[in-house]
């Protein structure tokens, strides 16, 4: 009898031990989060992710960190329609993530009346004395970062956004578009004559303008502005001048983790979107890979700081990217030309800058050969030249002048595009850490706010 009871107790103990890992995972995801890190790949739909995954695995011989997060964490599919549109843009999409309410196009965290501010997750954590950060490779006054810390009726009012971000007291601000912090007399775009860099320094910010200055910056509030316009595409970036997104993310986490109350930070791969607007597949892939490195920095931080909710997603997909099969010479379904992608040295935008406003077909052929090792035909080069002359309008921001270049390069790169603007494609949402158990199934991007708010137990 005693032997039977002993064997039964051993069996029950063994069964209990089997469930400990599961209960541990449940406990981890149900704990209150001290920190929240959200990374947003602007314009990164499933095809942009897929192209980078293929390139990384087949050319670089390594997997994406996002793949690891997908496999070990939580995964959902995300939709993002807004109050007034099926297809969103970045201001509305970021505002929905930041506030949990459906937004209207181009307004930054404002109610549908265009006058009433809607409180953001960053404003809520600020009230709880958490540190805050915004990091992007686009402009720090661009729509995605702006939606978390500013309220304006139209996203184009970037001078007001810059002012509001500093008044908010965001502890870490890193990105481009320094022009909105400087008066016109100093080469900026501010019409009020104010120099916000000087004002930031007086308010206790360290101002950094290069990768080296960022590296040397002490712990404390920092305003890193690394380009008068957007930061460079990763494919064009000069490492000695501009930091990578991963380097900015690492510095941001070093600073923000000093807060005893925890922190909230949004880190954006902002130029994925711009490259996709231009149908520039090599630049898209390089910027997704740079974004993935920043995801890796965040994942490494989370391993050492498990009370951190990590979220990785996108605001929308851009341009209907597709990985087509037919090659120029055959009907075989060989897929994206990885060698052609690998040989591409600069962005389409930089190439167009080299050949100027009135290029000859010969000049276009020369620069494409130098930049991509691709020999355009005379007709293809003429198509690009004609389209450039016809559509280039320096007075207006548009993508049309690169459309013909992207079109003639499609059969060489074997990457297709449905448009040069946003789409309503569903997106990926990955997560790990406290509160991430709510990430599952099909979700609307307003629910990301709910996940973050619940994880931090905000009221």
Language-model-detected regions and their locations in the chain:
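A post-motif C-terminal structural segment
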Residues: 34-35, 44-49, 54-95, 142-459
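Active-site-adjacent structural elements in enzyme catalytic domains
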Residues: 32-36, 43, 47-48, 53, ...
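Positively charged n-region of N-terminal signal peptides that target proteins for export
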Residues: 1-7
């Amino acid at each position: 009898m005693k032997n039977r009871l002993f064997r039964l107790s051993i069996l029950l103990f063994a069964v209990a031990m089997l469930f400990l890992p599961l209960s541990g995972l449940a406990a981890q995801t149900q704990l209150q989060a001290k920190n929240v890190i959200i990374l947003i790949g602007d314009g990164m739909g499933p095809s942009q992710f897929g192209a980078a995954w293929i390139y990384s695995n087949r050319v670089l011989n390594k997997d994406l960190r996002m793949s690891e997060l997908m496999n070990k964490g939580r995964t959902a599919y995300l939709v993002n329609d807004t109050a007034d549109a099926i297809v969103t843009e970045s201001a509305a999409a970021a505002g929905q993530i930041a506030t949990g309410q459906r937004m209207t196009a181009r307004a930054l965290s404002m109610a549908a009346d265009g006058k009433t501010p809607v409180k953001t997750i960053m404003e809520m954590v600020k009230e709880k004395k958490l540190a805050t950060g915004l990091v992007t490779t686009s402009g720090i006054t661009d729509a995605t970062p702006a939606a978390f810390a500013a309220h304006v009726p139209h996203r184009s009012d970037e001078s007001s956004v810059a002012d509001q971000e500093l008044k908010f007291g965001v502890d870490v601000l890193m990105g481009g578009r320094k022009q909105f912090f400087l008066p016109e007399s100093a080469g900026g775009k501010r019409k009020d004559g104010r120099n916000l860099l000087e004002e930031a320094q007086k308010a206790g910010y360290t101002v950094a303008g290069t990768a080296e200055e960022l590296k040397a910056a002490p712990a404390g509030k920092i305003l890193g502005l690394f380009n008068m316009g957007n930061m460079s595409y990763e494919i064009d970036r000069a490492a000695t001048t501009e930091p990578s997104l991963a380097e900015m993310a690492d510095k941001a986490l070093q600073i923000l983790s000093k807060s005893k109350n925890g922190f909230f930070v949004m880190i954006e791969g902002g130029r994925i979107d711009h490259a996709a607007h231009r149908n520039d597949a090599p630049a898209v892939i390089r910027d997704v890979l740079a974004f993935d490195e920043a995801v890796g920095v965040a994942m490494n931080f989370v391993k050492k700081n498990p009370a951190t909710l990590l979220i990785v997603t996108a605001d929308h997909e851009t341009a209907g990217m597709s990985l087509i099969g037919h090659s120029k010479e055959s009907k075989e379904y060989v897929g994206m030309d990885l060698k052609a992608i690998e040989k591409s040295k600069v962005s389409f935008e930089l190439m167009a800058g080299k050949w100027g406003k009135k290029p000859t077909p010969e000049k276009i052929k020369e620069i494409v050969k130098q930049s991509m090792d691709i020999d355009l035909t005379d007709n293809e080069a003429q198509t690009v030249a004609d389209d450039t002359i016809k559509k280039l309008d320096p007075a207006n921001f548009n993508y049309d002048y690169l459309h013909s270049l992207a079109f003639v390069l499609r059969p060489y790169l074997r990457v297709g595009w449905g448009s040069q603007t946003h789409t309503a494609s569903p997106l990926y949402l990955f997560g790990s850490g406290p509160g991430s158990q709510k990430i599952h199934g099909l979700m609307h991007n307003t629910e990301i706010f709910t996940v973050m708010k619940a994880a931090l137990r905000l009221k």
